[in-house]
UniProtKB/Swiss-Prot annotation:
Keyword annotations: Chloroplast, mRNA processing, Plastid, RNA-binding, tRNA processing
GO cellular component terms, semicolon-separated: chloroplast
UniProt KW RNA-binding keyword: yes
Claim: Heme is one of the keywords in the record: no
Similarity section: Belongs to the intron maturase 2 family. MatK subfamily.
GO molecular function: RNA binding
Name the record gives this protein: Maturase K
InterPro entries: Domain_X, Maturase_MatK, Maturase_MatK_N
Protein role: Usually encoded in the trnK tRNA gene intron. Probably assists in splicing its own and other chloroplast group II introns.
HAMAP family with a match to the protein in the record: MatK (MF_01390)
Location relative to the cell: Plastid, Chloroplast
Name of the gene this protein is made from: matK
GO terms of biological process kind: mRNA processing; RNA splicing; tRNA processing
Amino acid sequence: MEEFQRYLELDRFRQHDFLYPLLFREYIYALAHDHGFNSYMLLENIGYDNKSSLLIVKRLITRMYQHNYLMISANDSNQNPFFGYNKNLHSQIISEGFAVIVEIPFSLRLISSFEGAEIVISYKLRSIHSIFPFLEDKLPHLNYTTDVRIPYPIHLEILIQTLRSRVKDASYLHLLRFFLHQYSNWNILIITTKSISIFSKSNPRFFLFLYNSHICQYESIFLFLGNQSSHLRLISSGVLFERLYLHKKIEHFAEVFANDFPVIPCFLKDPFMHYVRYQGKSILASKDTPLLMNKWKYYLVNLWQCHFYVWSHPGRIHINQLSKHSLDFWGYFSSVRLNPSVVRSQMLENSFLINNAPKKLDIIVPIIPLIGSLAKARFCNALGHPISKLTRADLSDFEILNRFLRICRNLSHYYSGSSKKKSMYRIKYILRLSCVKTLARKHKSTARAFLKKVGSEFVQEFFTEEEEFLSLIFPRTSFTLRRLYRGRVWYLDIIFINGLANHE
C-alpha cells in the first residue's frame, strides 16, 4: 500500500492534480486487480492473470476515438470486442481503471496520507444498525410513511456535472464523458433496469461510484432544504450503496444552492420528519397530517424533474397510514397496531376503568415472498415443496450440510427481530428437507432411506442453533433465555440486506 501511495504522491506533485496521465500508469491497473486491495476497493478479483500493458491501454483509448470502430448496434453489444461483457478482458481493464482513478479525489484514505488531514466522519449518514433503533423507538410514534424509490437512470451530463465539482482535470472528464456516452449509445448504462444490471455486474466499482455520486448529490440538496425549512434538523439515517460509511460530505450547501432555491417554503416545516434510505429505496415517516406528506411528495417530484431532469410520476409515491398498512422495507413487514388494555383504578370509595391503547410494533416475516426467493434459488418449487439442489460432485457431505446450515443461520439471524418467529419454522423445514434430498440424491438414495441410515439427529442443527447461541450468554434453564428467544433480538452481524430477503 505504501508503494502505491508513493507513486500517487509523485504523480500528484508532477501533474498538479491531473488525472488523465494516470490512465497510462500500469500500477493503477495492478491496484485495481491486486488481492490486497479487494477489501478496500470493493472489487472482487475475477481472474486477471495477464499483466496490463501500457501499449494496450494506449491502443484502447485510441480506438475509443475512432468513430467507425464504435458504430455498433445495441443488438451486437454482446459481440463487441471492446465493451463486450466477458468477451474481452482488456475492455474491463480500462473501464475499471477509470473507476480507480476517479475515486482518488474522493478517497480520504489516500489523500489524508498526502496532506496529513484527518478523516472526518459525517454525522448526516449513519450505520446500517441505526435502522433497528428507528424501527423500535421511532416508528411506533409516527403516523404516516411514504415509500420513495429514488428514480434512475439520470442524464449523463448531470453525472459529469456532479463529478466536475471535485475532479479538476478537464482532459480526464472529457474522456470520461466520451466513455459514458458510448455506453449510453449501446443501451448498456442508462436505458433499462436490465441494462443497468448488466453494467453493474461487468463494472461493479464504476457503477457503485457513479450511483453513490448521484445519491450524494440528491441527498445533499434534500437534507439542505429540510434543515433550512425547520429549526430542528431533519433526522436522517442511511448508507451508501454496498458501503457502510461515508468519510466526508460537504456541510455548507447554502452558497452552492442559494441561487437555485432562494426561498424555502414554510409549509415544509415538520420537526418530526424522518428520512431513512438503503440502496435505492427510502422512506419518509412523519407524525403530522397527510397534507404535509403530500406536499413533501410533490416537492420531491419537482426536485427530481427540475434539478436532475428525471421523470417521476407523483402517483408512484404512496402515502400509507401505519395503523392500516404494513411498511415493506429491508425485507421486513413492519406495522404499528393498537394494543388495547383496561386498567381498573380506585380512588377512595370510587372505582373506575381506564382504557389504554398503546401502540405496538409488529415486525412480520414476509413468508410468501421469502418462499418465492427460495424457489428462485432452487431450494423448493413455487408451492414451497422442498426439492434437491444441484451441487458439485466433489463436495463432501459435511460441506453440503455446512452450506445449508450457513444459509439457515443467516436467515434466522436476519429475521430474529420479528415478532412472530413461528413462521421461520417453515423456512427451516424447507431448507432441512432440501438438504436431506440433496444428500440423498448424491448417494443415489431416497430421502426416507437416507434419514433412516444416518439418523434424524443429522439435521437437528437447523432448529437448535439459535438456542445454543443464546445459552452461551444466559443459562439454558433461565426465564431470560426463553423470553429472549420469543422476543426481538437484533444481531450486529447484519451489515447488509440478505440476498434471499431481497424480494425485488
